[in-house]
Amino acid sequence: VTAPNFPAGWTAVPILGGVNFVTTATNPDSAPNSAFAADPDTVGGGTDLSTPQFPITSNSATVSFRHKYNTEPGWDGGVFEISINNAPFQDILGAGGVFLQNGYNGSIGAGTNNPIAGRQAWNGDSAGYVTTIVRLPSAANGQNVQLKWRFGADNNTAPVGGGWNIDNLVVSGNTQ
């Protein structure tokens, strides 16, 4: 997929006045681009990047993706969410998923206009791309799911050029 497009059916939506996810050819993990949410220093809020729905056909299904983040530690960051059969999105851990590699590394402070305030999240500096692997919840087996990456920021302080890049999503262990 060539920037500025996302793959068919993917959506990017700003929330609470945040800066939207975009595709960028700058620093992708693999060519030609990656999804990127900038970490703003003057605007709070966030952005959601969502997949289209797809079926899960195994109790052992996993999702892996490569991402890098450089955000204001403890105040700006990202989370991974799931919707099963059009139910409201919830954090992957709250839904019963398990991080097998590179799960959340901290939490986001409460009391700001950050839409993920008070939650566990990826934040700070990953120092390059890392691979996250998550086993999907058993409740997803035999169901349609939708995945979402949610980035949130407060309204001050951010690293220069900071944000969150997401690339190379792979769903494994899903029998056809």
Locations of regions flagged by a protein language model:
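Extracellular beta-strand ligand-recognition surfaces/modules
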Residues: 65, 117-159
